[in-house]
Amino acid sequence: MKSFKASPVTPLVLLVLLVALSTASAQPAPTWKPHGREPLEKYDNPPAPPRTIETSPRMISPFGVFISYQVNVDASGNNIIGDAANECTISVDPTNLSRMAIGWRQFDDVTSNFRQAGYGYTTDGGLTWTFPGVLQPGFFRSDPVTASDETGTFFYLSLRSSWPVQTFFCDDMWRSTNGGATWDLISGKQGAIGGDKQWFTIDKTGGPGHHFQYQSFDQSNCAGGLFNRSSDAGVTWETPLDIPNEPIFGTLDVDSNGNLYVGGEGSTFYCARSSNAQIGNQTPTFDQVIPVDMGGDLSGGGINPAGLTGQCFLAIDHSGGPTNNNIYMLASVLPPGQSTTEVMFVRSTDGGLTFSAPLRINDDTNHQSKWHWFGTFSVAPDGRLDAVWYDTRNAANNRDSQLFYSFSTDAGVTWSSNVAVSNSFDPSQGYPNQSKIGDYITIVSDETGGNVAYSATFNFNPNNGQQEEDVYYVRVFPGGQGATPTPTPTASPTATPTATPTATVTPTATPTPTPTATFTPTATPRPTPTPRSEPTPRARPTPAPRLAG
């Protein structure tokens, strides 16, 4: 009988195979090109059955001078173990900066991707938050978008669908006149029409379109088109219309003359203008649609397997100064030949006719191999630009992410050195039976800083041994740039989870918590951003305006 002698290299080969398998499993998912003809949001899970709710202390996560406060807490201010919350948008009352509201996708149980329209509000500048529940208990909702008018009235645009057969894919509009504490459906069920990946803006110019609302969405929609308008502050909405070249996955804004601009990506990025959307008795037309070079394309997958790695944000300067009516666009894009995303920025000083060459905001040296995703920004009343995004530059596994911040005081010509403003978190933890942490985060700026709503996985769920997705608020500000934040250990809950004998995960409404501190935005001297050379603008002819038919 032939005998075999074990090779001394066999254990080494096995070890190499195990390491290879482990490494492969840690690799990000492939990236993919998003398109609007297949919805990114689907009603494909029923609600999870009722369960006993466990809680742990709410998370307050300091990182140097920046402090993140958990938003989705129960009636007692505790973290709810086993739920998930992501894809958050923030609104700020311009008449009282201590009053803010955040909307998000609320998953009552991570075993089901059934989601609802969660919301929370604060009256003390974000130190404490109240989470009364969801807009409409038991109804599937997604893609939350919130905004405020100049009086401090908040609006919440929410996507709805049906199950098990998807018979509609429409939006409706809600309004709050008490700082986000309660919300009323003003458009009627599915009354805003719309569709998937919708966004909206409010005309606050005081002109003929004052308080008009404008909405854009993608091709997975309720009644065709990509755009519609409300001339009565969100109550009734007109039949949707097409936008030439079909820019989607973007946002809208209105300049001081009442011109509407829509940013998004079709075959390339576009900036579309309607100069007559503000005229109530005219059908809106898009009289200028200009291609924009953002230095890459939008993408999905990768570090956020089932979601986008970012969308296109467009915002306009309303400072009234030399930069007034500048149009800015920012997006996390996948550059040609690269497998990870960069935060890129462009500027127009001539009403969207031409744009600057794309400028990279993330300043890390090994940026080509790192992820810079969910990039978003806002324009302060004085014209300062604040940008935030998720960033893996400090992660050996190229997955753990931190929220980063940069600002510009010269219309985006130069940007300050990037600074981390949060602890590190693993975005692949706590998926609610859907492999993503949403599709976007948001920021709203005032004269001394920016208010950010983002999702992170700082809390731990002992029932499944994973971190869990929650919504956080953090205030970023230029004064923090002078300090080098020292990472502080994430504040881990130490209390034993407490079982609460209740059959629903949705917190009940409670009176607004007594503020523990009075929030007053304190003006800090704004350091001059460290100049970083802007690329020389690429010479190109001025595109001829494209007229909508």
Where are these regions (language model features)?
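C-terminal PAP-associated
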Residues: 27-485
